[in-house]
Regions:
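Short, basic/glycine-rich phosphate-binding loops at helix/coil junctions
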Residues: 44-49, 91-98, 116-126
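Conserved protein kinase catalytic core
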Residues: 41, 92, 188
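Active-site metal-binding loops of divalent metal-dependent hydrolases
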Residues: 35-36, 87, 157, 183
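Short beta-strand segments at enzyme active-site cores
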Residues: 33, 79-86, 180
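Short acidic, Gly/Ser-rich segments with clustered Asp/Glu that frequently serve as metal-coordination loops
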Residues: 37-43
């Protein structure tokens, strides 16, 4: 049961019906680049894998560009950046029920590689991913607590599976989730939209990349004002 071949689509920008208006706070937030590995991205027709045949307007490529902006902004603001990455050649005892839905998963080191355009640096943390949620069989929650962080900015694939599940679990652990709609991609525009609608009404603030950057700029300006007064 392999991943489906995903047709290009564009996620239509819309006003999300958020029940919360949490601002992104650079002193509280971390960024999670979710499952942006070759195995998952190559399922998208026209995905930019560095081979020169990309469809620029396809949502996966919009997401890649926006994730790059978010990573750069996070580094500049001192926000820790985390990645999830599933390991290749998983033992059936580790993979278990995922086999029934998705088969054997990643089979080689190349398929497990994070895209070059988004590759982690030495300052970033890569979490081994075992289930839909980034928190399962992972030190993620402990790392957040140790660093005093309780906001989670999420971008990557797939919006309605791992990204949404991670947002839900963050919420249930009293960590404020932020789903960055234009830095996500999914099996279809409909599933992408449904994931964002569910998150905005049940567990997260859904926003776009420009909103994250604006919140960071507001926080930086406020900090500068406070320093000037001191």
């Amino acid at each position: 049961m392999a991943l489906p071949k995903i047709k290009p689509y564009t996620y239509v920008d819309r006003e999300h019906s958020n029940r919360v208006s949490w601002p992104v706070d650079p002193s509280r937030a971390v960024l999670l680049v979710h499952d942006m590995q070759v195995h998952f991205v190559q399922a998208f027709e026209g995905a930019d894998l560095g081979e020169g045949n990309a469809s620029p307007d396809a949502q996966i490529n919009v997401a890649i560009r926006n994730l790059r902006r978010l990573i750069d902004a996070a580094h500049a603001a001192g926000i820790p950046v985390y990645y999830t990455a599933q390991p290749p050649r998983q033992n059936p005892e580790d993979r278990r029920l995922l086999i029934d839905f998705w088969g054997d998963g990643l089979q080689n080191d190349e398929s497990a590689r994070v895209l070059d355009a988004l590759a982690p640096t030495d300052r970033d943390t890569v979490l081994t991913k075992w289930r839909y949620s980034a928190f399962v069989r992972s030190p993620f929650e402990d790392l957040l607590k140790e660093s005093g962080r309780d906001q989670l900015i999420i971008g990557g694939v797939y919006a309605h599976i791992g990204c949404l599940t991670t947002a839900l679990e963050a919420f249930m652990r009293d960590i404020q989730p932020f789903m960055v709609a234009d830095a996500l991609a999914d099996f279809s525009e409909e599933e992408h939209r449904l994931a964002c609608e569910y998150a905005s009404g049940r567990c997260a603030r859904v926003l776009n990349t420009v909103d994250v950057l604006a919140d960071l700029q507001t926080a930086e300006s406020a900090e500068g004002t406070e320093e000037a007064r001191a």
